[in-house]
């Protein structure tokens, strides 16, 4: 720890800066998508768990939705099960889905729960199948080349999209001071399980809960402009325009769309933040500068003094 970090005056200054944010967001729900480097580096893992506990202690209700793609890939490799991808999505047959459930609903989920509990919180691990929280349907993937007269439907197995989020279980746990930790596995009316993109699940959970914030932890600093600077304080109209003119493209586009749709669906603000920064969630919520890209149509969300 640096000498500055030990300076009591600096500690008081930080707490003073955080106070209006704590007052404003107390009693609100914040949905956090946890993944990337923040999930694999020991220092970041510990800081994330402490962030969730601190949020709960100051009256904010965090809800965690996590990924686990690398961990799924590792176990599939150990079991000599080939991984195939179509459009960046894992082709998930019945055998692969069993592994997905074991990893997401078991290994990864309970590891996060344990970390939060060891940091002084009360976390409960769930999948979307518990309490039928996440009703899913199979995702239809279309492929078409210029030579084709019509697109073909590609069957990628047990990969789904969200049809409905039931919030009663999440709300009950949050009201009893628990921190829900949700694996992105959904179920359809026939009881079939589906692996769903964790960003999309987090966005839909945030919409269903009427959350104050959706926070997507990533391995980048945020949405960058042509000069390499992080853009923030963006409206949905601005983001739509940047998607339309090609300013936003490539790997960031799916996350931006997820964040955008959440705000359009009633979430006060979405944040794409740098999960490589220790305590990124607290820095984004409780400081004036933040550590990522904020998307909101609520002018006062940029600063509590506005």
From Swiss-Prot:
InterPro entries: AceGlu_kinase-like_sf, AcgluKinase_fam, ArgB, Asp/Glu/Uridylate_kinase, NAGK-C
Subcellular location as annotated: Cytoplasm
An example Gene Ontology molecular-function term: ATP binding
Name of a matching Pfam family: AA_kinase
Similarity-based family: Belongs to the acetylglutamate kinase family. ArgB subfamily.
Name of the protein in question: Acetylglutamate kinase
Species assigned in the record: Chromohalobacter salexigens (strain ATCC BAA-138 / DSM 3043 / CIP 106854 / NCIMB 13768 / 1H11)
SUPFAM superfamilies documented for this protein: Carbamate kinase-like (SSF53633)
Keyword annotations from UniProtKB, A to Z: Amino-acid biosynthesis, Arginine biosynthesis, ATP-binding, Cytoplasm, Kinase, Nucleotide-binding, Transferase
A Gene Ontology cellular-component term: cytoplasm
Role according to the record: Catalyzes the ATP-dependent phosphorylation of N-acetyl-L-glutamate.
Binding residues for substrate: 68-69, 90, 195
Swiss-Prot/TrEMBL GO biological process terms: arginine biosynthetic process via ornithine; L-arginine biosynthetic process
């Amino acid at each position: 720890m640096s000498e500055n970090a030990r300076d009591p005056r600096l500690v008081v200054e930080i707490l003073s800066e955080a106070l209006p944010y704590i007052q404003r967001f107390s009693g609100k729900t914040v949905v956090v998508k946890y993944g990337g480097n923040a999930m694999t580096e020991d220092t970041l893992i510990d800081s994330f768990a402490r962030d969730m506990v601190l949020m709960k202690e100051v009256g904010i209700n965090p809800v965690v939705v996590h990924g686990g793609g690398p961990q799924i890939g590792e176990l599939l490799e150990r079991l000599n099960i080939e991984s195939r991808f179509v459009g960046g999505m894992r082709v998930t047959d019945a055998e692969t889905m069993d592994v997905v459930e074991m990893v997401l609903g078991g290994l990864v989920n309970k590891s996060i729960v344990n970390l939060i509990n060891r940091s002084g919180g009360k976390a409960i691990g769930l999948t979307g199948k518990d309490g039928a929280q996440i009703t899913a349907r199979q995702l239809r993937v279309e492929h078409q080349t210029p030579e084709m007269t019509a697109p073909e439907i590609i069957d990628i197995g047990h990969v789904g999209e969200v049809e409905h989020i039931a919030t009663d279980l999440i709300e009950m746990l949050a009201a009893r001071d628990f921190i829900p930790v949700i694996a992105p596995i959904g179920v359809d009316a026939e009881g079939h399980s589906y692996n769903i993109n964790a960003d999309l699940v987090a966005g839909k959970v945030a919409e269903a809960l009427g959350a104050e914030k959706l926070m997507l932890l990533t391995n980048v600093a945020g949405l960058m402009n042509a000069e390499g600077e992080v853009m923030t304080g963006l409206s949905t109209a601005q983001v739509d325009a940047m998607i339309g003119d090609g300013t936003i493209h490539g790997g960031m586009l799916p996350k931006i769309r997820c964040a955008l749709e959440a705000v359009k669906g009633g979430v006060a603000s979405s944040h794409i933040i740098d999960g490589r920064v220790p305590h990124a969630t607290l820095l984004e919520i409780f400081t004036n500068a933040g550590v990522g890209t904020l998307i909101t149509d609520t002018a006062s969300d940029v600063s509590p003094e506005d």
